[in-house]
Regions:
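Membrane-interface catalytic loops of GT-C/OST-like multi-pass glycosylation enzymes that act
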Residues: 43
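Alpha-helical transmembrane segments
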Residues: 21-29
Length: 335
C-alpha cells in the first residue's frame, strides 16, 4: 500500500472512529433524556445534574459525529479547480523590480497555487468562460498572495497574516521571523546535497504523488535534490514576514535574490522543482500526520501539476533558462 493510500485509510479510520464515538454519546445522552421524560428517574433528588450530564453527552456526540463526517468526506471529495487569476493583480500597486523578484515569487506560487482551488458551481461556470476569473469571495477574503506584486496582498485578509505566522510557525516578532527564515534556508542548502532517492522510502514517496496525478516522465529522481519544500517555504515565510512588518523590504529583496539564484543553479526546469517540492512535502506530511493529511496531499499534487502545465498559469511563458540568462547578463561581481 502506497503512502497516499495509507494516509487516506488513516483519515477514513479517524472519521469512522469519531462518528461511532459521537453516535454512542448521542444514544446514551438521548436515552437518559427520554428516560427522564418518562419519569424513570423520578426518585432522583438532583435531577438537574442528570439533565446537564445528558445534554453534555448529546452535544459532545453531535460535535464528534460532525467532525467525523467532515474528515470522512474530505478523504473522498474531489479537488477544486485552480483560479490562477487570483495570483495576478490586474494593476500591481508595487511592481516587481527585476527577474530575481519575479522568479522568487513564482517559486512561492508552488504553495500559493494550493490556496486557490475552488469547486462551487457558480465560480466554476465563470472560470469556464474566463480562465483568469477572479472569484469575488477569494478577492475579498482569500489567503493567497499575488505573484506579480511585491506586497502581494490584494484583499481584506491582511490582518490574518500575523495570526497565520503565529499559529503555524510560532512567529511573533522580527527575531523569530529571521530565525525561521534562516532555518528554512539552511534546510534548503542541506537538501541540495541529498537526492530524492536518498529517502529510505523514496520509491513509496514517488509512487504516491504519481498515483495522484503528478507526471514525472523523463525525470531522474537520482539527479534531483530534496531542497524543494524548504526552498518554497523560505520565500513564503519571507513574504508573509514582510507584510506582517517583521522584516524590511530590502531583506525580502535579498532573500528573493538568493532563492532565485539557488533555483537557477539547482534545477534544470520548473518540473524538477515541482518534483522535489512534492516528494519532500510528502516526506514531511507522512511524519507530521496532521488532520486531513490525504486531502492536503491530493490538493497539493493537483495544484502543483496544474501550476506547471496550464497555459493560464503564472509559470506559462517562463523558464529557468531565462532566469539563468538573467544572472549571466549581470556585471561581473553581481551574479
Amino acid at each position: 500500500m502506497s503512502i497516499a493510500k495509507k494516509l487516506k485509510f488513516q483519515d477514513l479510520k479517524k472519521g469512522t472512529a469519531s462518528l461511532l464515538k459521537g453516535l454512542v454519546s448521542v444514544v446514551i445522552g438521548g436515552g437518559l433524556i427520554i428516560n427522564e421524560f418518562l419519569n424513570y428517574f423520578s426518585s432522583i433528588e438532583n435531577k438537574w445534574i442528570l439533565w446537564i450530564l445528558s445534554s453534555v453527552l448529546v452535544i459532545y456526540g453531535l460535535v464528534k459525529m460532525f467532525t467525523g463526517w467532515v474528515v470522512f468526506q474530505s478523504a473522498n471529495q474531489s479537488v477544486g479547480e485552480p483560479f490562477f487569476g487570483l495570483l495576478i493583480l490586474p494593476e500591481p500597486k508595487a511592481p516587481l523590480q527585476n527577474d530575481e523578484e519575479k522568479y522568487a515569487f513564482l517559486i512561492d506560487g508552488f504553495y500559493e497555487s494550493s490556496l486557490i482551488l475552488h469547486d462551487d458551481k457558480e465560480s466554476l461556470a465563470e472560470l469556464k468562460n474566463n480562465p483568469l476569473h477572479r472569484r469575488e469571495l477569494s478577492v475579498q477574503y482569500g489567503d493567497s498572495f499575488a505573484l506579480n506584486d511585491f506586497y502581494g496582498i490584494y484583499n481584506e485578509a491582511e490582518s490574518t497574516v500575523k495570526s497565520s505566522l503565529s499559529n503555524s510557525w510560532d512567529i511573533n516578532s522580527s527575531e523569530e521571523a529571521r530565525e525561521q527564515i534562516a532555518a528554512l534556508w539552511d534546510g534548503a542548502m542541506e537538501g541540495a546535497e541529498m537526492s530524492l532517492m536518498a529517502y529510505s522510502n523514496a520509491e513509496d514517496l514517488i509512487q504516491s504523488i504519481v498515483e495522484l496525478g503528478f507526471d514525472n516522465k523523463d525525470m531522474d529522481a537520482e539527479k534531483i535534490n530534496v531542497s524543494g519544500f524548504d526552498l518554497v517555504r523560505t520565500i513564503w515565510v519571507a513574504r508573509h514576514s514582510y507584510v506582517a512588518g517583521y522584516i524590511e523590504a530590502e531583506e525580502l529583496r535579498a532573500i528573493s535574490r538568493n532563492v532565485a539564484a539557488f533555483t537557477a543553479a539547482n534545477y534544470a526546469n520548473w518540473q524538477e522543482l515541482g518534483y522535489s517540492y512534492l516528494v519532500s512535502y510528502l516526506d514531511w506530511l507522512e511524519n507530521a500526520k496532521p488532520s486531513f493529511a490525504y486531502n492536503m496531499l491530493k490538493e497539493r499534487v493537483y495544484a502543483v501539476s496544474q501550476y506547471l502545465s496550464q497555459q493560464h498559469s503564472p509559470l506559462a511563458g517562463t523558464s529557468l533558462d531565462e532566469l539563468r540568462a538573467y544572472f549571466d547578463s549581470l556585471p561581473v561581481g553581481e551574479n
